[in-house]
Amino acid sequence: MTNNLSGYRNKFVRVKTSKKRTVSSSNWLRRQLNDPYVAKARMDGFRSRAAYKLLEIHEKFKLFTPNMKIVDLGAAPGGWSQVASKLIKASDNNLNNKIISIDVLEIEHVAGVEFVQKDFFEADTEELIIQALDGRADIVMSDMASNTIGHKATDHIRTLLLCEQAFEFALKVLKPSGHFIAKIFRGGAENELLYKVKREFKTVKHFKPSSSRSESTEIYLVALNKK
């Protein structure tokens, strides 16, 4: 099971304050050092703890199978692309599997992944992805989130806007019966988006993986079987 953390829960690590380190950065470092999923990701060879969120989503909904075409939006540092590559048994020589990953930040190569280093919101990016797909996608997935500022309402709206744009893109490239996965932050303004998604997909679920931090308002929108 992805949430088996036996052996990864270490003693609490304290972080000393420093004149060169802000309070927020000290808190982030303390959280990272004491997060068992961070340690597990390091041991399992994943680039981020977010990999376990996608693994849990797959365990719940059984989305990934071999011979799929997948788009990973906001892919850096590549944890979700790594998981997708493993689940569909992708390789650089298997043309039946295709993962197109996009981010403005560079990521190291992942087997079976074609990386597009572009800002998703630039005018020509969608066309580049569509050309790289050479067909329609089975899954569009997005773990994109805006840089949080600690104001929950603002963080909620900003990440919701990213999800909306990912959804509009998914409608253009998904094949019938394709799936859409995206992060949102709960906050009340998501209802209109959920209404739109439910019109386009047969089944729409909310899911909060156990690997998602308990204090976080993030949940994942899992939209199954595009109409």
UniProtKB/Swiss-Prot annotation:
Residues engaged in binding S-adenosyl-L-methionine: G78, W80, D103, D119, D143
MF term (GO), any: rRNA (uridine-2'-O-)-methyltransferase activity
Catalytic activity: uridine(2552) in 23S rRNA + S-adenosyl-L-methionine = 2'-O-methyluridine(2552) in 23S rRNA + S-adenosyl-L-homocysteine + H(+)
Localization (cell): Cytoplasm
EC code: 2.1.1.166
Example of a GO cellular component annotation carried by this entry: cytoplasm
UniProt keyword list: Cytoplasm, Methyltransferase, rRNA processing, S-adenosyl-L-methionine, Transferase
Stored Pfam families: FtsJ
Predominant localisation class: cytoplasm
Catalytic EC class: transferase
Active-site residues, record numbering mapped to chain: K183 (proton acceptor)
HAMAP family per UniProt: RNA_methyltr_E
Family the entry assigns: Belongs to the class I-like SAM-binding methyltransferase superfamily. RNA methyltransferase RlmE family.
Cross-referenced PANTHER family: RIBOSOMAL RNA METHYLTRANSFERASE (PTHR10920), RRNA METHYLTRANSFERASE 2, MITOCHONDRIAL (PTHR10920:SF18)
Function: Specifically methylates the uridine in position 2552 of 23S rRNA at the 2'-O position of the ribose in the fully assembled 50S ribosomal subunit.
The name this protein goes by in its record: Ribosomal RNA large subunit methyltransferase E
Species: Rickettsia africae (strain ESF-5)
Annotated gene: rlmE
